[in-house]
């Protein structure tokens, strides 16, 4: 079975910027105003964020290739993954895999952005991306019925 997943760069960057904004706003209380301002990213930083998203997509391919075959491309502002799932794959997992890949990419972008300015906060986002990695591996392994 073939699973086709397309995720646009703009979706990933928009979500990452939004979450960075909310994180920055939550830190504006007290002495953390300077840090809060540093955390936030705008569309002006897309040239910095884009390579983080591309790196996340490549890392995702490496992960998927451990359990299934994947072809990956990036063009026209979209990441395209074509996954050849194992026999008897539960296709109900496909949208959940897409969601986990999206979360993984967003959290990796945020983690990379924060790694220089707030490594202690970046660690949280790298851990969240690792949770998505585990979820993807588990979902790719799901079958309609057990293989005997």
Task: Locate each region found by the language model.
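Short, well-structured alpha-helical interface segments that form or flank functional binding sites
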Residues: 47, 51, 55, 100, ...
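Short conserved catalytic/interaction loops centered on acidic-Pro-aromatic/His motifs
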Residues: 118-127
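Short, charged/polar micro-motifs that form catalytic or ligand-binding hotspots
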Residues: 39-46, 50, 91-100, 115, ...
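Conserved short "hinge" loops at termini or chain/domain junctions
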Residues: 1-89, 128, 134-148
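Amphipathic protein-protein interaction modules
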Residues: 73-115
């Amino acid at each position: 079975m073939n699973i086709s997943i397309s995720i646009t760069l703009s979706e990933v960057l928009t979500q990452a910027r939004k979450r960075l904004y909310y994180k920055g706003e939550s830190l504006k209380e007290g002495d953390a105003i300077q840090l809060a301002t540093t955390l936030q990213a705008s569309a002006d930083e897309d040239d910095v964020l884009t390579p983080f998203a591309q790196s996340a997509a490549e890392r995702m391919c490496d992960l998927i290739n451990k359990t299934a075959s994947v072809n990956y491309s990036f063009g026209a502002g979209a990441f395209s993954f074509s996954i050849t799932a194992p026999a008897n794959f539960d296709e109900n997992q496909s949208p959940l895999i897409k969601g986990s890949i999206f979360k993984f990419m967003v959290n990796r972008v945020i983690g990379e952005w924060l790694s220089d300015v707030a490594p202690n906060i970046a660690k949280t986002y790298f851990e969240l991306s690792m949770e998505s990695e585990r979820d993807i591996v588990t979902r790719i392994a799901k079958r309609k019925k057990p293989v005997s």
